[in-house]
Amino acid sequence: GGEPQYTAEEYKDLQQFAMDCGMNPISEIDAPGHSLLFNRYVRNNIEEIRKVQGFENMPEDGIKSDRDWELLSVKGESGQWALKFLKALYSEYLNEADPVFLGDTVDIGVDEYWSIKNDEFDGMRNYIREMADTVQESGKKVRMWGSMKQYFDDKGISTKDYTDIEIDFWSNSWDNAAKRSAEGFKIVNVDSFHLYGNTGRDKRDVVNVEHIFNNWTPVTFSSSGTVQPADPNLLGAKTAMWADIADMGVTERDNYERLMRQAAVLSEKTWGGTDEDQTYEEYSLKF
């Protein structure tokens, strides 16, 4: 219930625990879409924000899109305030003296800026570049959710100045894995058609582990061209479990069961391959 959250110290402890177990945590600030929390924070704390140098004149709704509370603005004066606000947030969390984000890669999000308007595309592309530059100044690599088709391809804009950003490919309606690789982008396969689980929701509740074991490989992308097994730009694959909204009672144990099975089969197929003589039933006995 409520709004689960970590303090900065708790989040650092969680990352350090993962790193002690051999994992590299990738932290994400998913904006300018999915930004209701930031807009609400500014509205509720505007007087405190105005005490910060450089933010004395921020309007009450200074970073919000004028059409949706879920979106940060990417145009006009409010778009400039949004850039300034997010840059300040990244600078705080990537502070070299005491960083909150410990991994070597930071994800800037930028997916699902719903119903983007013609006068917002330039601002979106500028937002991507500005946030990437801000993260890179701290020595981190930058990643984003694959959205180049929407923001670049469909508008006839070249991506050549953005190939320093790694791409999490998640949807063929938002990006094209083969095209991005050919352009020089490093890509990660997290194709929603195969690898998404939406716990207790109206879409796929559980990743079809048996299907993944029998039919999937790291170069399997749904309707997005062909990526070759030896492609040096394919960094690997990952699975996703979106457990933030549930239409029915879901416990932490339910999520744990799903995540373990998803992660295990993805590891088997990505790192270990599959013994041609091993059946899914034999594999599943490991659990």
Regions found by a protein language model. Give the residues of each.
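Soluble non-cytosolic domains of exported or imported proteins
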Residues: 5, 9, 76-80, 84, ...
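Flexible, acidic glycine-rich loops studded with aromatic residues
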Residues: 155-165, 172-287
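Acidic carboxylate-rich catalytic motifs and surrounding loops in phosphoryl-/glycosyl-chemistry enzymes
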Residues: 30, 144-151, 278-281
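Active-site-proximal loop/turn and secondary-structure-junction residues that shape catalytic pockets
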Residues: 29-35, 112-114, 148-150, 171-173, ...
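Active-site neighborhood of glycoside hydrolase catalytic domains
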Residues: 60-166, 170-185
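Feature activates predominantly on carbohydrate-active enzymes
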Residues: 1-107, 130, 134, 243-245
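Short acidic, glycine/serine/threonine-rich loops at helix termini
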Residues: 36-43, 118, 155, 199-201
